[in-house]
Amino acid sequence: MKFFFSIMLLLAQPALSQIINIDQARAKKTVLAIPPLLFVGNPSSYPNHASIGSELYRVIQNNLTFSSFFSFLPQSSFLEDSKLGVKPVPEPNGFKFESWKQIGAEFLIKGQFSIAGSTVNLEVFTYNVSTQKLVFGKKYSGSADQARKLAHTFCNDFLKELTGKEGVFLSKVVVSSNRGGSKWKEIYVMDWDGANVEKITNHKSIAISPAWSPDAQKVAYTAFVQRAKSKTRNADLFVFDINKGTRWLVSYKPGINSGANFDPSGKYIYLTSSQSGNPDIFKITLDGTQVQKLTNGPTGAMNVEPAVSPDGSKLAFSSDRHGQPMVYVMNIDGSNIKRITFAGRYNATPSWSPDSKKLAFAGWENDHFDIFTVNADGTDMVRITSSRKPNGKWANNEDPSFSADGRLLMYTSNRTGTYQIYISNLDGSEERRVTNDNFDYYKPRWSGNL
């Protein structure tokens, strides 16, 4: 069944554009109480109801934990039976606000769900405990295999209601990985929290450097493919259409065709190509025609890893034109090139914030990579990561990507031995691990909500 949700007209007071101040939430987290979700129906008729309810609850709590705005009261502290209804007294079987106020809850999330055939109906009510008012209530419906999506959608709505800014819980990640223990690297798509992993390439080769189109319906990537009548593999650029399940070859000039990045319109791709000798940055259409060269040396220099700003006005890239690789920014037409990073001996993989005001990048210093952010004009550089391996040696933190709301950074780290995906706040705080296995992940790229 196609996923859908319906908004119930349950508002008990005028909608508040912002209840929680995002900046203040950094200093003091809002205290939430979330009792287990109630099942409405005959348990014997739906033996899978417990697993569905557990998954809904787990996803909601995990999402809101990752948001970093909230702390949670343990269920052992609850004074009321969790089987009480989702509405307050005097409703039959209603709960009492005083029971939640006594244990320090600022907001109470009460939810219930039912199952009709293959459809799950989730109904959630959020209450301000101090004012004893309903903040909002919504009903979400979808097939049982989309229970996670129901929970993600509620969490996005919850954050939008309380902070004025939607969450990122319906976003996806595209990444290169050797999952399955293969000697090859293929391209995978997963939910932002590491669930629902789907392999989208099967080149049985090295597929790297994936990039989302602006609408997250296409993925550009590079794969080292075998050419006909040749023993060598070439780094060719492909685009994969997720909805149609089709792919096509975009750039296959001899040499490098890599580091693709879509422009905001989705009509053009910026990539690194060595078709004229040394690697330079080119702009091409999605069918590989209308090629425009944007950088030209200097002689012997490499210009790689293009990243178009979300507003479409600038392009960041890595270049060793002054000796060591550093990050540069230029106008989208290739003019007015300016070096903006000076972190250690090697700076690479620039990634723009959604507002086009900041860049994140990986910088090599003291024999390891860390993630840094810097303003687009080169000011206010900040180190985001610093981690060690179990043996005490410095770990590498690489390949940053901003969340669509600009509040979070995703990156890879080899602190556990293999390169796993992590997320932190923009200041590096509250770092959390996304993937938990023994495979390696490279260059994750974070989409907007889908």
Put a short name on every predicted segment.
Residues 168-169, 214-215, 264-265, 310-311, ...:
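Residue-level detector of Asp-centered blade-edge/turn motifs that repeat once per structural unit
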Residues 416-424, 428-450:
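Blade-level signature of beta-propeller repeat domains, shared across WD40, Kelch, NHL, RCC1
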Residues 166, 178-186, 202-205, 223-237, ...:
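A flexible loop/linker signature enriched in serine peptidases of the S9 family
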Residues 17-66, 179:
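A structural "domain/chain start" motif
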Residues 173, 219, 266-269, 312-316, ...:
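Hydrophobic beta-strand positions that form the internal "hydrophobic ladder"
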Residues 19, 88-157:
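Amphipathic beta-strand/beta-sheet edge segments enriched in Tyr/Trp
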